[in-house]
């Protein structure tokens, strides 16, 4: 059979198997490599959302498309949608606002600080597993309600932006003044590979250490939840224990106690919970598990109407406020105006109602005007009253409505924008003017930048400063590689490597770093004193240029004359603009590019290399060439020699690959150093090299070896240098959202 006929035959087989119930497919499941070799290093994180996956093509630039959008027209359309109830999914109280607030919140609320993953950017709520999480029940309908608007504006607004904007408009349509909105969230085209936990069942919780602490980087207490179980930890209705979990999980989203209280109290001012029936008897499969005829919708409810007064979502039932479609103080007034006792929803879930039947007719029914109900609270709501810190905040907010309103506005803005990175990425006319500390502010460029002649002169001064090639490369890499593309934080801009906490990170070799920075600061000061026409250069630029001229020098010594691109314009942040605790989570526990690994790392050295490369948005070839080049440049953390497979360190040669692939070397585990390997001459037994697993994986892993062979070939030197410079420049400019 010709290979070209296989795809069409496969399509025919698929169609026939689907027609007959899928039996043929079930019998022909392919056993993949991961089954046979589960310990094999997984490179797929470096192949996510490739440009080829984007149907808009490589010439499409979302920022430009968004700038052509009439944002006011979009908001007008969204506002109209709020009260245009659809028969297939009617709105509660005649208003979709609370439903869309939940959608936006749950889109953004999966963000977590430890790895920067989650959040609204990418529009990941559309994909598995988030689109089928138990905590996201029925949000498939919210996105489907939005489709006509997304269809109308097409490529000009992403799903990520649209969901957040809709949450804002929902709040505004119910009388709340939001803090602002920024566009700029570029959509993904596939599910992001995220460690959401190892549990094999929804709502299971096997993510705590022996001390009972939630494992990093998890942001929720149970599989499939955004934060906590609203009924209490693992369903136990203990408000104080719930408060402890709330504080932990919201803290993992970068929220302090005041922001946490504002979000919960503000969010629960609107809408209601849905638990009209027992979900086990009424609700069908989630979207991912539903048939093709469901067209991406799930949780089909066979009880009653299947919606409206028969809706089943969380299993909890009722509203917190008397007017659930308006901004009021009723949530806090009710929280403190009643004593609360436990009861069960019609679905059998634990919730709280006023004691002694009080308030029984306060809350209107969402669909039947002839009915009224008592307000309800979750265990997680009662926690805001019983926990001492939360109680102080809620009582203060109750007495100061304007303070509460501003706190919720700012907390909502932070919730929905935390994963976007610095303000330089914000788009649109609704961006608030105020600079917030969690945006990692950097001063705006306020002077002319240096020109090519200045750059050349500055580079020469750096090389004449007495600093070595490895020292300059290590410092530039430490500065720039702090960037993580998951939430666009870190990077060389701002020169925060000279500030707390980065200046004392172990991976950055603080003692050497202080020496290098002192010399670079002197060069910067001398150059700035001689520049004309108001021109200046920042230390951030000097650090990057220092690494770049060092690479040029190292390439020349390897016989290749090159020019490393350099674009000035970075600025220097101050310590006051740097939240130490916020930046602390960026500290690397491992950096395979520098052969640094600490025992605090959550995975093996090779796996942590993939994680770091993924954070830097690198491809497999880019990661490979950078590791080989940085080893040749002797850029390991603290100057360790593992993996420096060359007799001329500090030279940009392809020796790492040549010597790694050399069959005259036999590798074995060191008997003296844990986690270290020794390379001995096969004939003499003489020790030639030492290495870490990160070094050796480029010869042992079949795919990485294939790339290594390209750079280790006799004609590989020039390609190696050129590719290294491209990858180096990519990392140095990873946070340059201004170019």
Curated annotation (Swiss-Prot):
Per the record, the GO terms for biological process are: cellular response to hydrogen peroxide; hydrogen peroxide catabolic process
Please name the catalytic residues of this protein.
106
Comment on bound cofactor: Binds 1 heme b (iron(II)-protoporphyrin IX) group per dimer.
Q: Which Pfam families match?
A: peroxidase (PF00141)
Cross-link (Tryptophyl-tyrosyl-methioninium (Tyr-Met) (with W-105)), chain numbering: 227-253
Alphabetical UniProt keywords = Heme, Hydrogen peroxide, Iron, Metal-binding, Oxidoreductase, Peroxidase, Signal
Write down the position(s) of the site called Transition state stabilizer: 102
**Which Gene Ontology cellular component terms are annotated?**
cytosol
Q: Which residues form the signal peptide?
A: 1-26
**Which cofactors is this protein said to need?**
heme b
- Which top class of enzyme applies to this chain? oxidoreductase
Cross-link (Tryptophyl-tyrosyl-methioninium (Trp-Tyr) (with M-253)), chain numbering: 105-227
Record's catalysed reaction(s): H2O2 + AH2 = A + 2 H2O; 2 H2O2 = O2 + 2 H2O
- Subunit (UniProt): Homodimer or homotetramer.
Q: Can you name this protein? A: Catalase-peroxidase 2
From which organism does this entry originate?
Shewanella sp. (strain ANA-3)
Gene expressing this chain: katG2
């Amino acid at each position: 059979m010709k290979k070209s006929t296989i795809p069409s035959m496969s399509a025919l087989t698929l169609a026939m198997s689907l027609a007959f119930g899928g039996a043929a497919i079930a019998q022909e499941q392919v056993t993949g490599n991961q089954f046979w070799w589960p310990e094999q290093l997984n490179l797929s994180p470096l192949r996510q959302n490739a440009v080829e996956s984007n149907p808009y093509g490589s010439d499409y630039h979302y920022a430009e498309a968004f700038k052509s959008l009439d944002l006011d027209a979009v908001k007008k359309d969204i506002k109209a949608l709020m009260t245009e109830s659809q028969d297939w999914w009617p709105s509660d109280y005649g208003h979709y606002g609370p439903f869309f607030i939940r959608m936006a919140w749950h889109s953004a609320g999966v963000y977590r600080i430890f790895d920067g993953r989650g959040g609204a950017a990418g529009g990941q709520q559309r994909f598995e597993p988030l689109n089928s999480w138990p905590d996201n029940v029925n949000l498939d309908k919210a996105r489907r309600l939005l489709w006509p608007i997304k269809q109308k504006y097409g490529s000009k607004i992403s799903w990520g932006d649209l969901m957040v904007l809709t949450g804002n408009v929902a709040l505004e349509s119910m009388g709340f003044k939001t803090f602002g909105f920024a566009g700029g969230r570029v959509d993904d085209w596939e599910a992001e590979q995220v460690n959401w936990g190892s549990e094999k069942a929804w709502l299971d919780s096997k993510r705590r250490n022996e001390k009972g602490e939630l494992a990093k980087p998890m942001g929720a207490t149970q599989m499939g939840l955004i934060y906590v179980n609203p009924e209490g930890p693992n369903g136990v209705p203990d408000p104080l224990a719930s408060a402890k979990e709330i504080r932990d999980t919201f803290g993992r989203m970068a929220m302090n106690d005041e922001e946490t209280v504002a979000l919960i109290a503000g969010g629960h001012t609107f809408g209601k919970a849905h638990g009209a029936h027992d979900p086990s008897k009424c609700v069908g499969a989630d979207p991912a598990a539903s048939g093709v005829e469901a067209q991406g919708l799930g949780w089909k409810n066979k009880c009653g109407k299947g919606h409206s007064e028969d809706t089943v979502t969380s299993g909890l039932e009722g509203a917190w406020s008397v007017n659930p479609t308006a901004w009021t103080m009723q949530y806090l007034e009710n929280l403190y105006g009643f004593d609360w006792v436990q009861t069960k929803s019609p679905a059998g879930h634990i919730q709280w109602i006023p004691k002694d039947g009080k308030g029984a007719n306060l809350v209107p029914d969402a669909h039947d005007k002839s009915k009224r109900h008592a307000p309800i609270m979750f265990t997680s709501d009662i926690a805001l009253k019983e926990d001492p810190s939360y109680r102080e905040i809620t009582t203060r907010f109750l007495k100061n409505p304007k303070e509460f309103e501003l706190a919720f506005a700012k907390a909502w803005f932070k919730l929905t924008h935390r994963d976007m990175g610095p303000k330089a990425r914000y788009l649109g006319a609704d961006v608030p003017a105020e600079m917030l500390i969690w945006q990692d502010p950097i001063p705006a460029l306020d002077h002319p930048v240096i020109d090519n002649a200045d750059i050349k002169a500055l580079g020469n001064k750096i090389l004449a400063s007495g600093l070595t090639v490895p020292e300059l490369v290590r410092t530039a890499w430490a500065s720039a590689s702090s960037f993580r593309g998951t939430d666009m934080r870190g990077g060389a801009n701002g020169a925060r490597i000279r500030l707390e906490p980065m200046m004392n990170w172990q991976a950055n070799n603080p003692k050497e770093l202080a020496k290098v920075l002192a010399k670079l600061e002197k060069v910067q000061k001398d150059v700035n004193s001689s520049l004309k026409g108001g021109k200046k250069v920042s230390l951030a630029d000097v650090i990057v240029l220092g690494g770049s001229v060092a690479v040029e020098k190292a390439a020349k010594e390897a016989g290749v004359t090159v020019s490393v691109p350099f674009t000035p314009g970075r600025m220097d942040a101050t310590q006051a603009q740097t939240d130490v605790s916020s930046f602390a989570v960026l500290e690397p526990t491992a950096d395979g590019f520098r052969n640094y690994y600490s025992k605090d790392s959550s995975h093996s050295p090779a796996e942590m290399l993939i994680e770091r490369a993924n954070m830097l948005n690198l491809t497999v070839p880019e990661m490979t060439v950078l590791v080989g080049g940085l080893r040749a440049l002797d850029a390991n953390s603290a100057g360790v020699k593992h993996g420096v497979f060359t007799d001329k360190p500090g030279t940009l040669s392809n020796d790492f690959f040549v010597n790694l692939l050399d069959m005259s070397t036999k590798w074995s585990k060191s008997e003296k150093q844990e986690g270290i390997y020794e390379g001995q001459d096969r004939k003499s037994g003489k020790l030639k090299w030492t290495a870490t697993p990160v070094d050796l994986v480029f010869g042992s892993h079949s795919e990485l070896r294939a790339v290594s062979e390209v750079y280790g070939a006799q004609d590989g030197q020039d390609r190696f240098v050129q590719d290294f410079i491209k990858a180096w420049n990519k990392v140095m400019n990873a946070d340059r959202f201004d170019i």
